[in-house]
């Protein structure tokens, strides 16, 4: 059996200059494929609210739903570090209440770490969690749970003050004990600067090549949304015509009584 990745391994990978590979997953079947490909970190993101549930934002996702999906993903991962994304409203009620939520989430889901959004305002909470054996991955930049405060899904850190705030937030999270930080939707130069200033790794999504690792939403990189994927996504499969074509072929064969054939039937 392969050695399971833990949060300290991510720090070691940064120290050795080894890029960290991360992807999202939301179910057992895709988690098995991702894990078999030696992905280092599997994030069960609250992005499932959009790509699985069909919401316009991540905000409607509940902690119970995150636990449900993470439990399925954890069953499919033998090596990858499984991280549960704490949904909107589960980390904003102070360190003690957040600890209760996070401890329950890890206990019931099988996750080995949790992710939460926010910088200096969340530093006390991050410290409280890490002091109590809950590994934390931070998330800065275009944090989806703040979509309404941002006025939409907009690139962050473009002016000097905003860039400095992100850099200060990253340092605060590191000092609070975060094991890694996701940098999303910020200029590549800023992401590289932040990455070089930290001893913990950064994992970028729409943040350029200067981060210590990369993460993508798996449905985006598999091309399951046609032309709706963000600019920073590279499609490694054009999934809509491939999967849509397979479904269409099945429909036609059933309607034409071409399926099932004797090869797919039982005689006795």
Swiss-Prot record:
Where 3-methyl-2-oxobutanoate binds, per the record, is at 46-47, 85, 115
Q: Which residues cross the membrane?
A: none
Q: What InterPro entries does its record include?
A: Pantoate_hydroxy_MeTrfase, Pyrv/PenolPyrv_kinase-like_dom, Pyrv_kinase-like_dom_sf
Q: Which Gene3D superfamilies match?
A: Phosphoenolpyruvate-binding domains
Q: Give compartment(s).
A: Cytoplasm
This protein's record includes keyword Disulfide bond: no
Q: Which cofactor does it need?
A: Mg(2+)
The SS bond pairs are none
Q: Which GO terms describe its biological process?
A: pantothenate biosynthetic process
Q: Where does Mg(2+) bind?
A: 46, 85, 117
Protein EC: 2.1.2.11
Task: Say if the entry is tagged with keyword Metal-binding.
Answer: yes
User: What pathway is it annotated to?
Assistant: Cofactor biosynthesis; (R)-pantothenate biosynthesis; (R)-pantoate from 3-methyl-2-oxobutanoate: step 1/2
The record's comment on cofactor binding reads: Binds 1 Mg(2+) ion per subunit.
What reaction does this enzyme carry out catalytically? 3-methyl-2-oxobutanoate + (6R)-5,10-methylene-5,6,7,8-tetrahydrofolate + H2O = 2-dehydropantoate + (6S)-5,6,7,8-tetrahydrofolate
Q: Which GO terms describe its molecular function?
A: 3-methyl-2-oxobutanoate hydroxymethyltransferase activity; magnesium ion binding
Q: Where is the active site?
A: 184 (proton acceptor)
> One GO CC annotation, please?
cytoplasm
Supply the SUPFAM superfamilies for this chain: Phosphoenolpyruvate/pyruvate domain (SSF51621)
> What Pfam families does the annotation carry?
Pantoate_transf (PF02548)
The alphabetized UniProt keywords are:
Cytoplasm, Magnesium, Metal-binding, Pantothenate biosynthesis, Transferase
| Recorded family membership | Belongs to the PanB family.
Q: What does this protein do?
A: Catalyzes the reversible reaction in which hydroxymethyl group from 5,10-methylenetetrahydrofolate is transferred onto alpha-ketoisovalerate to form ketopantoate.
Please describe the quaternary structure of this protein.
Answer: Homodecamer; pentamer of dimers.
Name the record gives this protein: 3-methyl-2-oxobutanoate hydroxymethyltransferase
Q: What is the lineage of its organism?
A: Bacteria, Pseudomonadati, Pseudomonadota, Alphaproteobacteria, Magnetococcales
What is the primary gene name for this protein?
A: panB
């Amino acid at each position: 059996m392969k050695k399971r990745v833990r949060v300290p391994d991510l720090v070691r990978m940064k120290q050795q200059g080894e890029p960290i590979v991360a992807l999202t997953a939301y179910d057992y079947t895709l988690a098995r494929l991702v894990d078999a490909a030696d992905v280092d970190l599997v994030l069960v993101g609250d992005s499932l609210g959009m790509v699985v549930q069909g919401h316009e934002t991540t905000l409607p996702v509940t902690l119970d739903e995150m636990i449900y999906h993470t439990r399925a993903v954890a069953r499919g991962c033998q090596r990858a570090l499984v991280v549960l994304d704490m949904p909107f409203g589960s980390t904003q009620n102070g360190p003690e209440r957040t600890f209760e939520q996070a401890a329950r989430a890890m206990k019931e889901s099988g996750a080995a770490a949790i992710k939460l959004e926010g910088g200096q305002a969340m530093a006390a909470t991050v410290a409280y969690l890490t002091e109590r054996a809950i590994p934390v991955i931070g998330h800065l930049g275009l944090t989806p749970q703040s979509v309404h405060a941002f006025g939409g899904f907009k690139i962050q850190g473009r002016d000097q003050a905003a860039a400095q705030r992100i850099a200060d937030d990253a340092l605060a999270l590191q000092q609070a004990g975060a094991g890694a930080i996701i940098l999303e939707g910020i200029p590549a130069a800023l992401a590289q600067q932040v990455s070089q200033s930290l001893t913990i790794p950064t994992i970028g999504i729409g943040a350029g090549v200067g981060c210590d690792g990369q993460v993508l939403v798996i449905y985006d990189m598999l091309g399951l949304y046609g032309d709706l994927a963000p600019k920073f996504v590279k499609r490694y499969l054009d999934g809509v015509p491939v999967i849509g074509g397979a479904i269409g072929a099945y429909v036609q064969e059933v309607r034409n009584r071409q399926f099932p054939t004797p090869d797919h039937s039982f005689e006795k």
